Amino acid sequence: MDAQAKKKAMFRSKLNAKKKDTRIDSPLVRYNESDQPVCRVCNVVLKSESLWDVHQASRKHHEAIDSLKASAAGVQRGSKPAETRPTKIEALAKSSNSQTSSGLPPNFFENREPARAEVEPAKSKNLEQSKHTIGSETNKSKGPLPAGFFDNQKTDSSNTKTTSEPKQSQTQTTGPETKPMVNGNLPTGFFDNKEADLLAHGIKLVKPDIKDEYKEFEKLIQDDLQVVDSRMEEEEVDAAETIEEEEQREQRSYKEKVEILKRKKMELKAARLAKRSKTSEGSVKKPKKTEEESPSDEEDDEDSAVDWRAQHL
């Protein structure tokens, strides 16, 4: 296990050294937490350093550079619109004043309540004047009428006041501030549209920002890529280990075969030497027999010669 851990560490150190050698030295590139190159202009994560040249030649990169240049030029021109804004506001104020002068008088709606307050004391003055006139007429026409006949006039006037007051209250309520009142709470899901339902319950909708969602999506992709890279590294390490083990096994099998062949060769050499020794021993024994048989052959030759002479005779 220690040897395997050392091998893995060596393999990873080699990979890290290769990555360091291929780093991009450019002011437009930065590296994130996972040692991936990121374009500072486009804020795009590159999968590898070899794609930097392709990204520089891309249309998106050039458009981002042009937008940065345009924004820098807009910052320099930002002081001019600030100076022109007050003139627009003054023009709007003049137009509103002209409308009020042509149609309704200025502060028409603001002075509406004091006008109502002036109407009420005028009405009270008219009532008092009517009382005085009625009293004078009664004083003139006093005679057979009983005393205190006109004392009930106060109650009549009070009744008239009470009847006039609710009318005034009604006119006040039917002013420009009349709004429909909703009694009770609506149940959830009353509206088919979710936005309208939430607004009816007083819940403000938060519109999702596309940029934030895109950044979250990029983070998820980066996390997935990190997981994939780690798995690839582990698989490469495991594959390297398995390849080394297979090579070692093949070498062992080849060594065993070589040893077996050497043994067979030695056995064959020994067998050949044994055969040669046997054949050499047999050849040594045969010449002795020939030497022993040679005098008998000479005798046979002499006998045959004697027989030949005898035949001629």
UniProtKB/Swiss-Prot annotation:
A zinc finger (C2H2-type) spans 39-61. It is found in: Nucleus; Cytoplasm. The gene is ARS1. Residues 155-176 have a biased composition (Polar residues). A motif (Nuclear localization signal 1) lies at residues 5-12. Its main location: nucleus. Residues 115-131 have a biased composition (Basic and acidic residues). It comes from Arabidopsis thaliana. GO terms for molecular function: nucleic acid binding; zinc ion binding. Disruption phenotype: Hypersensitivity to abscisic acid (ABA) during seed germination and to methyl viologen (MV) at the seedling stage, associated with a reduced expression of the superoxide dismutase CSD3 and an enhanced accumulation of reactive oxygen species (ROS) after ABA treatment. Residues 232-248, 293-305 have a biased composition (Acidic residues). This is Protein ABA AND ROS SENSITIVE 1. Residues 115-189, 232-254, 271-313 are annotated as: Disordered.
